[in-house]
Amino acid sequence: MNISRLFSFLFHGNLVKRISIGLLLGIIFALVSPSLESALGFHLAEKMGLLGQIFVRSLRSVAPILVFVLVIAAIANKKVGSKSNMKDIIYLYLIGTFLSALTAVFASFMFPTTIALATNEAELSPPGKITEVLTALIFNVVDNPITALFNANFIGILAWAIGLGITLRYASETTKNVMNDFAEAVSKIVHFIISFAPIGVFGLVASTLADKGLSALLDYVQLLAVLVGSMLFVAFVINPIIVFWKIRRNPYPLVWECIRVSGVTAFFTRSSAANIPVNMELAKRLNLDEETYSVSIPLGATINMGGAAITITVLTLAAVFTLGIEVSIPTAILLSLVASICACGASGVAGGSLLLIPLACSLFGISNDIAAQVIGVGFIIGVLQDSTETALNSSTDVLFTAAACMSEERKNS
C-alpha cells in the first residue's frame, strides 16, 4: 500500500471501520505499555490520552458555532408554509425518556440490586428541588448569546439562533446566501475534525484502560448488568417499537445505522454535545430535512436523555433496596416521571445525571449524605455507565429525528 492510498484510507475511508481499528489498537497499546514502562520511565498509554483529549475538545469547540450558524441559515431560508416536524420530534423525545425510566424500574424490580455505600470524596453541589432544575433551564433560554456560545449552553444558543433566523427571513437574498456559505464552511471544518475520530478513539481507549482498567468495575457487576441491560433493551426493543409506530416498516436498518455511526462515536467521546457534529453529518447522509435536524439534534442533546433517566432510576432504586425501603407501584411510576424530568435537565448540571440522583432519592426520604454516597458509586462505574448512557442518548437524537422526517415523507407520498 503506497503513501497516498494509506492516507486516503486513514482520512477518507469507511469511518466505522477506521474507528474499529483505532479501538483495537488502543486496547493492544494499553496492554503492551506496562511492559515498556521500565524502559521508557513513563506509561506510554496514559500519554496517548492527549490525542483523545484534543479530539473531544475539538468537537466540543466546534459544536456551539455549528449549531448557531446552521439553525440561523436553516430558519432564514425556510420556505413559507413548510413543515419542520419539531412537535412530533419533541413528543418522541419525551415519550422515549419516560419509557426508558419505566424500563429501568421494571429491570430493577426483576433484579433487585444492593450496593456498598462507600464514602464519596468528591465535593458535590446537587440541586435541591426539581424546580431548581427547571428554573436553570429557563435561565439558560434567556442567556447572553456570547456567554451561551462560550459555555456551550445549547438551549441559549438555540433560542438566539431561532430568533435571528426568523428575523433574517426578511433579509435580502444576498444576506441569506452569506449565511448559507458560512454554514457550509463550518460544516466542512466539522467534517475535517470527524476524519480524525479513529486517532481520538485510539487515545481515549488507551488512556482509559491504562488509568482505570476493568478491575474497578468487578465489584459492581450486577449493578452494571441492570444499567447496561436496561439501556440495551431500550436501544434494541423500545426505540425500534417507537420508530416502527412512526414509519410503519422494519425499523432495525435505521436503528442499527444510528447506533453504528452515532452511538459508537458517542460511546468513546462520552459527550452528547461533542457528538452533535457526528449526528449532523449522519442526518445529512440520510437526506433528512436540514430545517428539521439542524434544530432537533442540538435540542435532543439537551432534553432527550433516556440513558440519564435509566441511570437516575437504577441507582436510586439500588439505594432504596440497600436501605430496605418498601416501594409501591404508584411510587415507582412517580419515580419514572421524576427521573424523566431530572434527565431533561441533566445537561444543565455539572456532573450530569449522577448529580441529579439526590432529587430522585428525596422521593423516598433518603438523605443527601446517603445520596452523595450513591453518586460516589456512580463515579466508580462511570467509565462504562457514562459511555453507554451517552451512546444511547446521542444515537436516539438522530434516530427519532429520522423517524419523524420519514413519517412525514410517507404521509406526503
UniProtKB/Swiss-Prot annotation:
The keyword Transmembrane applies. It comes from Mannheimia succiniciproducens (strain KCTC 0769BP / MBEL55E). Keywords: Amino-acid transport, Cell inner membrane, Cell membrane, Membrane, Symport, Transmembrane, Transmembrane helix, Transport. It catalyses: L-serine(in) + Na(+)(in) = L-serine(out) + Na(+)(out); L-threonine(in) + Na(+)(in) = L-threonine(out) + Na(+)(out). The chain crosses the membrane at residues 21-41, 61-81, 89-109, 146-166, 189-209, 224-244, 305-325, 337-357, 363-383. This is Serine/threonine transporter SstT. GO terms for cellular component: plasma membrane. Belongs to the dicarboxylate/amino acid:cation symporter (DAACS) (TC 2.A.23) family. Gene3D superfamilies: Sodium:dicarboxylate symporter (1.10.3860.10). The gene is sstT. Involved in the import of serine and threonine into the cell, with the concomitant import of sodium (symport system). HAMAP family: Ser_Thr_transp_SstT (MF_01582). GO terms for molecular function: neutral L-amino acid:sodium symporter activity.
